[in-house]
């Protein structure tokens, strides 16, 4: 059976899953989304993802036309309908169809879309051997303009930095904020290890509050590792003993080179490996 896509209470074959060309999600990137993983048929931290979705929607004055409980059920039903156990879920809420102007008050009912599929963001060898990344010249959105804490459908800021990375032969790129501090990568949060401590930029550096980021911080603290959410600059990354990225799609992936600087000994480090193991164990609980 073709992949089934959920759109506002109905299921459609992948080829027939359509929304209006007047939807402001398409015309202006006006909407919010979440990317989630399922392991063994269970969505990892579904409640946390839905809480973040609701926060993003509230921040842009978008009312999600169903309860969290109903949406959670729809996500699980869509997974089951497609027979997916270990997969990726893309949950989208658009503003709905409106006029060609910006006025969101002219939009009709918001559209809720659920896509369940499989994803492999990076090749297996990158998880085994580590990524090489570069710093993009594209600055992460200033929080006073469009907060990175809002997971909106407008990802052009990230895409521009992603293009820079790809043009440099890298699949991921590091983004700085307007103050020149390390923010995050185009689709992942960043961590470094220095002298046995785990360091990561704080939320007010202009980053998305990653669900996987939070999980890794919890795992590190449970393992008695000191975790500091502090301001970092590129120099801190260059001289780190280890570096890794986290994200729902990426999970936990090591970084072994940044801007041509070798991180540590150029191999995924012991802390990275241990936290990766702990994370994979957590997802199966």
Residue ranges and their predicted role:
Residues 1-174, 178-181, 204, 208, ...:
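Conserved alpha/beta cores of soluble small-molecule-handling proteins
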